[in-house]
Swiss-Prot record:
NAD(+) binds at A33, E52, R53, G60, V124, H152, V153, D154, M219. The lineage of its organism: Archaea, Thermoproteota, Thermoprotei, Thermoproteales, Thermoproteaceae. Its cofactor is Fe(2+). This is Thiamine thiazole synthase. Fe cation binds at D154, H169. Disulfide bonds: none annotated. The keyword Metal-binding applies. Its EC number is 2.4.2.59. Belongs to the THI4 family. It is an enzyme of class 2 (transferase). InterPro entries: FAD/NAD-bd_sf, Thi4_fam, Thi4_prok.
């Protein structure tokens, strides 16, 4: 029995890693923006992998507002909630409350059911780039416990037509690319203090491509573009993820037509 368990895990786990070493879109971060983008991209037929450094979904959703188990979503994001069949309650002024556990579970299930592959416990260590001018064409990664231990272990690669940084406040992938590939011309300006009403709009407007092959969504947008933070209102995160999916899909389709031409 034990041997069968071990071989089943090794065989099918390694098959998944092999299959998803070459994808259309690699998303880093399984928070609200990353999971939303994954669902909308996967249902458009793109091969999507999501890497999450923790062994759980949701990013900053779980703690709610200062550990009170509710978060807020504004009117504009209600269509996204409906797409994922997430329940919400009106509180007035175009705002709604949502249960954090339900939001996490249904965002993740929606992405998985659409065809995205989510791999937990992955630390993205670097990007792959090609060309002059350069383009991001993939990622380097190790398992999170290896990174946390400080052990010197060479990472493995994932090839991707598009990489989406949805890592939250730290904008980890874009910060690495900005530092190590200065020819990409990326400036990480740093997140500002809170102004929720303004930032909820700006985070969606500034979602998109920051360099060839490299995109940003969610709180990482605030860090890259120097926007205010917003706290436990998550509509902007959902809308940012949806917009990132729309932009990436458009770019990938245009690239296919350009190659055929």
């Amino acid at each position: 029995m034990e041997l069968k368990i071990a071989r089943a895990i090794i065989k099918h786990g390694l098959e998944d890693l092999y299959e998803y070493s070459d994808v259309d879109v690699a998303i880093v971060g399984a928070g609200p923006a990353g999971l939303t983008a994954a669902r909308y991209l996967a249902e458009r037929g793109h091969k999507v992998v999501v890497y999450e450094r923790r062994f759980s979904f949701g990013g900053g959703i779980g703690p709610g507002g200062n550990m009170i188990p509710k978060i807020v979503v504004q009117e504009e994001a209600v269509p996204v909630l409906r797409d994922f069949k997430i329940r919400y309650k009106p509180v007035g002024d175009g705002l709604y409350t949502v249960d954090p556990a339900e939001l996490i579970a249904k965002l993740a299930a929606g992405a998985i059911d659409a065809g995205a592959k989510i791999i937990l416990g992955v630390h993205v260590d670097d990007v792959i780039f090609r060309g002059d001018p350069p383009r991001v064409v993939g990622l380097l990664w190790v398992w999170t416990p290896i990174q946390m231990s400080g052990s010197h272990v060479d990472p493995l690669y994932t090839q991707a037509k598009a990489v989406l940084d949805a890592t939250g406040h730290d904008a980890e992938v874009i910060s690495i690319a900005a530092r190590k590939v200065p020819e990409l011309g990326i400036e990480v300006r740093g997140e500002k203090s809170a102004w929720a009403e303004v930032s909820e709009k700006l985070v969606v407007e500034h979602t998109g491509r920051v360099a060839p092959g490299l995109y940003v969504a969610g709180m990482a947008v605030c860090t890259v573009h120097g926007l205010p933070r917003m706290g436990p209102i998550f509509g902007g995160m959902l809308l940012s993820g949806r917009r990132a999916a729309e932009i990436i899909h458009k770019d990938l389709v245009e690239e296919v037509y350009a190659v055929r031409a």
